[in-house]
Amino acid sequence: MTLARATELLKVQIDMGGEYNRNSAKMILADVSNEHGQAAVDQLIRTLKLDDIFDLKEGMKFRF
């Protein structure tokens, strides 16, 4: 998945909010981690403020 596509999908999850969407965001970040590494995940968390919205912190590892 491209980072642009990941950003697009994460914005949808942010707009809907809720616990299920937090889990979806974690799955998207796991895919980003597998393809682009932890730095890309941390950048998305910072850029989209996922720490405030879903309590997802920089440095967290996402795997599936």
Language-model features and meaning:
Residues 24-62:
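Short, charge-rich amphipathic interface segments used for partner binding and complex assembly
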Residues 1-30, 62:
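N-terminal acidic leader/helix
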